[in-house]
Every structure is written in structure tokens, then in C-alpha cells.
């Protein structure tokens, strides 16, 4: 073996071991300690003490997303994300936000296909305020005609601004509806404006009664707290809220094989065409999910990733390119894409993306690439847990979707257990032509 290659091999091994050791050491220092208990009404509570700063996060994750909706009443979960700031029996309309801002805090919420998440970030001496606000939301939120009409207008404007009037704004909507035929993942969380208009006040009130329940929620408190004091306050504000009286609806729908490839075209108000390749993907938490995540990191995490380097830097076919999967509770989907450079044929972008996928299908990645992937994943974990906001959200997600909040400290091991052979296997299984959607996104004629 020539000296250069021999030295290069040694340096690769030293570098990869060093990178893995450094990130493993850092991650080992970020083990999250927490207490967990459940109230008699089924509310799960997680407490994490962190006295680094005098702040606290109070969050509630409701296990309801767009997949819990009826096909003729889509958009309800996201609509309630807005409606739940209208107030309650004890909070005047429009005052919810003001309680938090006057305390020097901030608040926010989001809705996905699988969950709705609310949180307040407050100075720690306002812990009781945050708990009272969230208990009001859970116990007797204001669901009336005036609030419903107000939020209908807000949601319609949101759809216009974020989707209808944005280049490629309906891309996810167009991909999901083609990859799912039966499962409620086929519609996006924002749903149908026609469904929201057609719904009665009673429809909205029933949705609240069906899903905004203590036994359908996880309450997380993270930050500068005393756990014993926090427990007493949780019991004070939440223990008397009634639990559900019937089974909470969870869809149990298995899609048939896609029998692709599916090829289709969308015309949109865009200047540059785009090529989107979609595929069905494994459910979050399954063994294949972690291997597909590693594969997507290989293909598109950063400017040195395979798809970006090939399409953007080397061939200059695209101005942007990448690959990712949606972390969904049921089997979901993943997307690879390229936004074309001026004058580039989308067929050339399709060919270039598939070349990178086929390379993984046919050749094992190198040891150095695997170590680099592990390093990137560990860095992501460290970053996600670098704030009390991230800790609170992740504890709630692990408890809700996995039934085990302690995965906040151990899920990384599932990624590190992925082998080169696993990455090749899932590339062949999920990126197969029969499991593929190819979507041509073209400029609409004036």
C-alpha cells in the first residue's frame, strides 16, 4: 500500500474516533433528570429542575392532531390551536396573551398531524400563573360563535399568506394527498376552509369535549422550580378536571401498497420549476425509521451532503436540493427535491437525485461517513436539549408518542445502532420505484 493511502487511512480512523468521542462525551453530560407522576384523572405530569436561569416553561401536549379529524371536518385540530387563546370562563376574550406579556413572558403553540402543543415561557416566580392559564384552557375554554368567527378569518388569512400566496406553498399538501389514499395524513393540518365554514358551533364544541381532556394530555414543567411545590400547584389546578367518559378516537388505518411510480404535474405561481420525489416512510420510533433518518442525513444534511454537493455544487442543476422524512406517529412519508437552476430540465434533476439514491442502494457507505453521520446526529440531540424549551417539548413528545419520557436520554442509542447495512437496506426498501411519487412543479402561464 502506498504511504499516502496508508497515512490517509490512519488519519481517517483517528479523526472519526475523535469526533465520536467528543460528541459522546458532550452528550453524556446532558442527561436529563425528571420526575413523572399521573393524577387520578389521567393527566401525566413531568417535572424537570434546571436552576441555570430564573425561568420556567409550562407546556401541555394534547394527543390530537389532524389525523384525529373526520374527513368531512378537516382543519379542526389546527383551528383549536388558535381558538384556545380566545379565553375561558375566567379569562376575558383577548386577555390570555396579556397575562403572559405583563409577566414578562412569551407563549406559543403549534399543531401537527399527531399533536397540539402549547407552552408559556415565564419568570419562575410566575409558575402558578402559567399553570392557572393552562388549567383554564383544559377545563372550560371559550368555544362560542364570536370566537369561532374571529378565528375562521385568522385561519383563512394564514392559509393565504403561508400556502396559497407562497411559491411552492402547497407542495406538502400536493405530496401528502397523492401518497395517502385512506389515512387522514392525506390532508394537511390547516385543513379545508370549506369544512371550517360548514361546521356548526356544536361541531366545534364537541371536538373540544372529545380531545381537550386530562387523560389525553401531558403537562411538562421545566426550569427553575422546586418539584415539591410544583406538584402541589399541579394538583391544585388540574386534579379536579374530569377525565374522558368514552374512548378517545385514534385512527387505525393501514394503507395499501402504492404500486408506483406515480408521476404527476402541478402548475403554480413560481419562477423556477422544481422536481419532488416522494416515498412512503416508516413510523417514528420503528427500527427502520432511525435508519431512514441516517440515510436522509447522508443525502442532505449540510452543503457537503451527497444530494446538495452533486446537484448544486458539482452539476449546478439546482439552486437548492435536499431530502428529509416527516417524523409521524403512523407510517408517513419522505421527500427528496431539487429547485431547478435557470434553463435546467427537470428530468436531469430527477436523474441526478436517483443516481445518489441508487449509489446508496448499490454501495455500502464508508466507515468514515457512518462516523460522521453519528457525530451529526449526536450534535442534533445536544442542540435540541440545550434549552428548557427544548427539554420540555421533547419530554412531552417522548411520553405521548412513545409512552416513555426517559427516551430523552436513550433514543440516541437507536441511531448509533444503525449499521451501514441497515442504511443500504432501507434505501432499497423505501426508495424503491414502486414506492415512489415523482412530481413536476412547473410555472403557471400568466
What are these regions (language model features)?
Residues 74-88:
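Active-site SXXK
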Residues 48, 53-66, 75-79, 93-138, ...:
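M16 family metallopeptidases and their MPP-like homologs
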Residues 30-36, 176-217, 227, 249-254, ...:
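Histidine-acidic residue clusters that define the catalytic metal-binding segment
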Residues 181, 189, 214, 218-276, ...:
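An aromatic/glycine/proline-enriched structural segment found at the starts
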Residues 1-11:
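N-terminal secretory signal peptides that target proteins for export/translocation
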Residues 12-20:
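Sec-dependent signal peptide recognition
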Residues 30-49:
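Short N-terminal segments immediately surrounding and downstream of signal-peptide cleavage
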Amino acid at each position: 500500500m502506498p504511504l499516502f493511502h496508508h497515512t490517509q487511512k490512519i488519519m481517517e480512523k483517528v479523526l472519526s474516533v475523535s469526533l465520536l468521542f467528543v460528541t459522546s462525551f458532550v452528550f453524556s453530560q446532558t442527561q436529563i433528570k425528571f420526575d413523572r407522576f399521573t393524577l387520578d384523572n389521567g393527566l401525566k405530569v413531568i417535572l424537570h429542575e434546571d436552576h441555570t436561569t430564573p425561568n420556567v416553561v409550562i407546556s401541555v401536549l394534547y394527543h390530537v392532531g389532524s389525523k384525529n379529524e373526520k374527513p368531512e371536518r378537516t382543519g379542526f385540530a389546527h383551528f383549536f390551536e388558535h381558538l384556545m387563546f380566545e379565553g375561558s370562563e375566567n379569562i376575558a376574550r383577548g386577555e390570555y396573551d396579556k397575562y403572559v406579556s405583563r409577566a414578562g413572558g412569551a407563549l406559543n403553540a403549534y399543531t401537527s398531524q399527531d399533536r397540539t402543543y402549547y407552552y408559556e415561557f415565564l419568570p419562575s416566580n410566575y409558575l402558578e400563573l402559567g399553570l392557572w392559564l393552562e388549567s383554564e384552557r383544559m377545563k372550560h375554554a371559550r368555544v362560542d360563535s364570536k370566537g369561532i368567527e374571529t378565528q375562521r378569518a385568522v385561519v383563512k388569512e394564514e392559509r393565504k399568506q403561508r400556502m396559497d400566496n407562497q411559491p411552492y406553498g402547497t407542495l406538502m399538501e400536493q405530496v401528502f394527498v397523492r401518497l395517502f389514499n385512506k389515512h387522514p395524513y392525506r390532508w394537511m393540518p390547516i385543513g379545508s376552509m370549506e369544512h371550517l365554514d360548514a361546521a356548526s358551533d356544536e361541531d366545534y364544541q364537541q371536538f373540544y369535549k372529545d380531545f381537550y381532556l386530562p387523560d389525553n394530555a401531558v403537562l411538562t414543567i421545566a426550569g427553575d422550580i422546586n418539584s415539591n411545590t410544583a406538584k402541589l400547584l399541579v394538583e391544585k389546578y388540574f386534579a379536579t378536571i374530569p377525565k374522558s367518559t368514552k374512548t378517545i378516537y385514534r385512527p387505525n388505518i393501514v394503507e395499501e401498497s402504492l404500486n408506483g411510480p406515480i408521476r404527476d404535474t402541478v402548475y403554480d405561481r413560481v419562477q423556477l420549476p422544481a422536481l419532488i420525489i416522494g416515498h412512503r416512510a416508516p413510523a417514528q420510533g420503528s427500527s427502520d425509521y432511525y435508519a431512514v433518518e441516517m440515510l436522509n442525513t447522508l443525502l442532505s444534511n449540510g452543503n457537503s451532503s451527497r444530494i446538495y454537493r452533486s446537484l448544486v455544487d458539482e452539476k449546478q442543476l439546482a439552486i437548492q436540493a435536499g431530502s428529509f422524512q416527516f417524523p409521524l406517529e403512523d407510517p408517513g412519508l419522505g421527500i427528496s427535491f431539487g429547485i431547478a437552476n435557470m434553463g435546467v430540465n427537470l428530468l436531469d434533476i430527477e436523474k441526478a437525485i436517483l443516481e445518489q439514491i441508487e449509489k446508496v442502494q448499490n454501495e455500502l457507505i464508508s466507515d468514515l461517513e457512518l462516523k460522521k453521520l453519528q457525530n451529526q446526529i449526536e450534535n442534533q440531540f445536544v442542540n435540541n436539549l440545550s434549552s428548557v424549551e427544548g427539554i420540555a417539548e421533547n419530554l412531552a413528545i417522548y411520553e405521548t408518542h412513545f409512552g416513555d419520557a426517559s427516551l430523552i436520554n436513550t433514543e440516541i442509542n437507536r441511531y448509533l445502532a444503525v449499521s451501514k447495512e441497515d442504511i443500504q437496506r432501507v434505501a432499497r426498501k423505501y426508495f424503491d420505484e414502486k414506492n415512489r411519487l415523482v412530481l413536476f412543479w412547473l410555472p403557471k402561464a400568466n
